[in-house]
Amino acid sequence: MTREEAIAAGMEVHEIQHSMKRRTPWHDYSRKGTYMLTLVVRERRALLGTLCGSLEGEKGPYVEHSALGNAIAQEEQKKIHRFYPQLEVWKLCIMPDHLHMIVRVNENMENGKHLGKVVAGFKSGCNNAYWKLFNMNEPPRQGLFETGYCDKILMNDGQMDKWTRYLDDNPRRLMMKRQNPDLFTILTGMEVAGEKCQVVGNRFLLNIPDKVAVIVHRRYTNEENARLREEWLACGERGGVLVSAAISPKEKEVLREAMNRGYNIILLRENGFPKLYKPSGEAFDACAGGSLLQISPWEFHYEKRVITREQCLHLNAMAERIAGYA
């Protein structure tokens, strides 16, 4: 259900809470659906397992579960279906300091039960396993996980497949981050093209002299677009950098092709970066490989905004300055 549908149905819609663990306020969590849940260990302590393997090895990176991680995988997650038969855990991914679960609610829950109570019960079981394994017999005792949790509502099978692949790839991405920490660090207040910006990625791309600004104007003919596309991709082929805000569909198309080919890209963003930001999908690999730099002249915000014409002009002007056009 969208926000507009919720309002039309007479439901109370609250303002977005500035928290990485916010719920969708107009969704009924007692109804059937598919969710990806994320629970983070308090203080991000690596209590659930150890990252092993290598990027070059035949097995690849993987997480070897600790005794606590094993207890969660072998005992606690199975209790969810035992206590709530209408729920199934379709996927469990345990990382050293957090875990993800894809949970399917096959039937509506009744008598005041909802997903939040399911998670609370699961966390309670994990707490008991944690206290037992660490000999924490006397109160006060802290829980294993941070307060709250994050959920993502999976609306279709395509999302399910995407997030299953994402969870399977988690150990590899973590190892890449650990091997390339500077490429995933958020820098604030860095001066770029005369502005204080937030940046993530390979900052040395700014020093490459061969740069082009990928900007497509409406007045361009098909022939002009084809010629410019060829010139921009040729710059990438020779080791140069494509600079763009990727606003229009044709700009996005060029940047997507450049990323598929492994070319250097500087991407300008309307939004900044949250505290625990990391790129996803192909952008993650590009960042780890040193071929991507993301820049935003604005602070991060949680609201879903439509980029304004003024912001488009601002970012395009920045792209031209970075490319040395102005």
Question: Each PLM stretch: what is its role?
Answer:
Residues 1-186, 192-195:
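Short catalytic/metal-binding and nucleic-acid-binding patches
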